[in-house]
């Protein structure tokens, strides 16, 4: 009897380990991508849709807001990364079809237009949310937003607009707000993932953002990565932190892990 019981326990442990290993080593789903044309008034836009091919019905969606270059190869790379988690990702086109920056000299005025007109910025991002919810693979009740740099500002503005999403995640985004009282409209969880040495996000902006979140009773979290500057998720930013914008592998991996953990918390049975 004792041998039988011991053997049963060994089998149970072995089975548990095998199951755990199977989950840990499960292959990510294959992903597909396509562009989606849509309009706001008479203006045309072209977003990027990247989604998992799972055959399991509807999946949670991610509204992605691009960096100041516009929808680009970097946007696609990050969208594919998220889609491999079993999420359908729509990268909204803030600028308009065919309007893409070729370099910082183009990006600065493009991004500046929307940083200076938050109402227009919100309208562009909110329209993208509508397009995402229209996709047949997407569960419209399970949506988060994620943005990078300029796009990080965009997803926080989406939250300030009172959008009905579960969470917004800003990767090295701008935190300032010309209308901090709009924090009272936030329904979503707000996650800000920042580089400790980002020269483009001032200490005063961080303090004001935190005060906005506190006084508005938002469910929020800020994580600061030591040694990281602006654009820490973008390999194309180079490795020279002295420029103020550079890739940082540790911050990139840890921030994506933070995003992954949030998805697991919000959608445990996706």
What is each PLM-predicted segment?
Residues 1-12:
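Bacterial N-terminal signal peptides that target proteins for export
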Residues 35-137, 233-246:
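Serine-hydrolase catalytic machinery in alpha/beta-hydrolase-like enzymes
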Residues 78, 202-212, 221:
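Short alpha-helix in the alpha/beta-hydrolase fold that links the catalytic acid
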Residues 125-186:
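Primarily recognizes the serine-hydrolase "nucleophile elbow" in alpha/beta-hydrolase
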Residues 185-190, 216-219:
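Short, proline-enriched alpha-helix->beta-strand connector loops that line the catalytic pocket
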Residues 192-194:
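Short beta-strand/loop motif that positions the catalytic acidic residue
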Residues 197-201:
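Acidic catalytic loop of the alpha/beta-hydrolase fold
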Residues 214-270:
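C-terminal catalytic histidine-bearing segment of alpha/beta-hydrolase fold enzymes
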